[in-house]
């Protein structure tokens, strides 16, 4: 990629989906089948140890632990193919079954659909109310009884865990940092590549010969270190990734269960433009397969399925990474296609279902539609009944009863839905109730752009939801009008340009929405402004986070498992980002398609993500780590190589105050809402607020890297904590008293007016028509319980170890690292510095810090590795939601809700004590973003980089002069690995020996051997090490001797130098240098011209291909104005401000 100003902001825009829906295979005449219901794309139970041919399976098959339909009902919220929405409008998603050939040795005879099913009688006298009562009381077994013609009950599959794997618990029993005793001598061979090749299935791979090291005496038992070239060859994507497996279509399969292979429908720029291909790179193969990792199925659903998103990573022919982001939008099938599909479904029902089953399913659908109509009439009566009256209470009880009945009946219908018609009158939205997914995506080569691409895609796809995203201001000439998708695509891929360093930022507009693309400064951790790490910390406990980090450091084969594809993307990128300054150099596939699951047998380290809904997941025989993001568990075949004891305890302690969301703020475990779907709670929220602010937030890495441990947990100033952006369109609404956009000649240092300001008088006008079909009263049915009651689910409470009793449940500044009694640091704890002042000087603090290998700065009683979590309780005036502590404020009538932007109702409103966000009682259930006081991403990154800086503290001392041969090979330095390891304390030498066998550490050393120390990426980490040295006591700068270790670990700084910067200490200023943190705004022309045709039909369509007639000639190309176009009219297009003449050095 060219790094000049002509680099596009995105390389390609593409569309993928189903080209045609055709069932060309003839229907079988009458084959015997064992039909079993598998709702919402979930796996069909198989007999334990029996494959399709009836023979014993020679391998351990990965199987899901869900045993029946009842268990499946509770584990499928927010997924693509399950539509149990928050609002209580339960929906069925797909009528699908798995058809497998019946065998004589099976456990039961199949039902050919000619007789009554076992366990169910005729519909005569069937009582639905009794069935509902039985279903509510015996839900675990009731759905099993409804498996009518499936024959005898099959055995449930065991959990998807290899028998050799064990649950990893981060206990403090092995704190020496040595190898776990579970690893015997034969399995303790180091070397990531050879260790991965030693599992039993690699018969075709020959082990490397074991030769002693010439420079290491007595090293005959240690295998020779693999060369970088050999490691790269084994880690090559194309060498270990097999070709995709073909689709296996069963002629007896239900039409809605059949999978279709996704295809590329269109792309921009098109493939017939060779000059663009040469500049942007070759469009990779298999993009549709990564967009639909589990292929495509037609979905039967009452409402439009929820839109989801995910990112993926591919490797090109030259071994470079290509990153993609995609959003899935569901489009209704046309009437003719739906009619043909319904005919085939009816033929299947006639062949494979009994009359009783079909009648029961149809009757249940009719009954459900009647109950939904009854609910609508009750809700219509609600505004006319006075609040607080007995009639209102009775009406509320009646509504609750009907809602519960609808919920139960919908769950009953889900496993039987294949027996009913796809469309139920009064219940199904759209023409047919059949939906097909379509993927819109972006490709590029900059991983830091993925968050920007995602939010840009969400913005341009809002009109396609046809009102499904709530609280979007209506289009108008003043606010802005939607443009065709084609013009937005040209604007991103051709007219927009990549920012040049940290001196510029690119502003891209979508209607009134302004998005800002920035590049990290050279003295910042790459990706620290754009890569999300909160989602990973929400899914896993701190113990599991540290264990996962240890597995990644030793280059294990890590497999992430989740029901949400977006969560896989977030977790993989977060883990790699936390390894800085090390770079993951092996296989990296955040979303592994189902047809590439055999890649799990790759004989090298990898980080891959696997969806839980895949039908067959075969785990490796040995040497893997399975991380379940939905259940917060880690299963592995061996314990991780633990960090040295003091480093591990110090890292864990810093994470407790940097990521207190679960410990102190009651955040539930699991993927966040924005990882589950594109528009959580039908709102356009912004999990990355910096993308919508023209003023870049100041970097705090220098502060937390150099901050003393005793002050690491101090809260951010109230002026720096802003409420989350729950509606980006309201956040970017046009102010009539402000220019249309900030100028490009200088930086704009003022943020746009907040739409949630309690003193703001600029409120958007109420639309003349509802924003969407379900927006009346902002989804009244979804928030009815919140309006009638203030009872919410209990969440965990912050730990009393952080002084809860002293400071109360508010987000107030609290002293970090307190013990159970909540006392402040004192001189009695010798390892805690007296200096607890906040970071106010330009230096890195003058408080006490240990020397290189001293004991931890935290006393053992304050580490709290197994801290107990106390629950937080909701009261009449306090509600905890996503880390927000909402307190009821009486009389705050001038405040506006941060979620819906309406004024306070009644006599008050809820206000978060941490970020000052406001919310109505009915809007508390729609709070999808965490409070900024509950999670500090900069401090989390600082904790990990401090840990690695401590491990590699003296590495530069062992970079010496290269030999003549090394110099001829391009090396500027020669690293003495043996000398580096011998200089470490004894308890760290074994961990360093492990690191020397990893590819990431070898790449780390190789980069420093071949590049000067002034290189930006190298100098940054060296300055982090210097900041660690600056935290030490004055006069003990190096701190490498054993005597200095003893002195620093037992002597507290009690002189005046502890309270002021030491005069003799040279303060590194590189980390705190903000001279290049300018981010001047350069605006890209916003598409705003008129276009022919019906406005609504054009902007709301879900196109399968881009319409070139709706495109316009680019006004600029990557910021460069086009040459003057002198046609017959002799008009010259007006040039817009661009980046001409601007360079990072200016």
Swiss-Prot record:
Tell me the keywords, alphabetical order.
Metal-binding, Secreted, Virulence, Zinc, Zinc-finger
Entry superkingdom: Eukaryota
Please verify whether the record's keywords include Ligase. Answer: no
Where is this protein found?
A: Secreted; Host cell
Give all residue intervals belonging to the cDENN domain. 522-656
From which residue to which do the Phorbol-ester/DAG-type zinc fingers run?
883-931
- Domain dDENN: residue ranges: 658-1016
Knockout: what is the outcome? Enhances V.dahliae virulence in plants.
Q: Classify the main location.
A: secreted
The UniProt entry, under Gene3D superfamilies, shows: 3.40.50.11500
Instruction: Output compositional bias ranges, type Basic and acidic residues.
Output: 164-177, 732-743, 784-797
Single GO biological process annotation from the record: regulation of Rab protein signal transduction
What residue spans carry the Low complexity bias annotation? 744-760
Q: Name one GO molecular function term.
A: metal ion binding
CDD domains assigned:
C1
Q: Disordered: where is this region?
A: 25-75, 156-226, 730-806, 1121-1146
Q: InterPro entries from the xrefs?
A: C1-like_sf, cDENN_dom, dDENN_dom, DENN_C, DENN_Domain_GEFs, PE/DAG-bd, Tripartite_DENN, uDENN_dom
- Biased composition of type Polar residues is found at 769-783
Any Gene Ontology CC annotation: cytoplasmic vesicle
Assembly and binders: Interacts with host cotton EIR5A (AC A0A5J5T2N2) and EIR5D (AC A0A5J5NT52) and host N.benthamiana EIR (AC P0DXJ0).
Q: What does this protein do?
A: Acts as an elicitor that triggers defense responses in both Nicotiana benthamiana and cotton plants. Triggers the accumulation of reactive oxygen species (ROS) and the activation of cell death in cotton plants. Induces significantly enhanced resistance of Nicotiana benthamiana to both the broad-host-range filamentous pathogen Botrytis cinerea and the semibiotrophic pathogen Phytophthora capsici. Stimulates the expression of EIR5A (AC A0A5J5T2N2) and EIR5D (AC A0A5J5NT52) in cotton plants and recognition of EPD1 potentiates EIRs to enhance cotton PAMP-triggered immunity (PTI).
Q: What is this protein called?
A: Elicitor of plant defense protein 1
- Provenance organism: Verticillium dahliae (strain VdLs.17 / ATCC MYA-4575 / FGSC 10137) (Verticillium wilt)
Q: Which taxonomic lineage does the organism of this UniProt entry have?
A: Eukaryota, Fungi, Dikarya, Ascomycota, Pezizomycotina
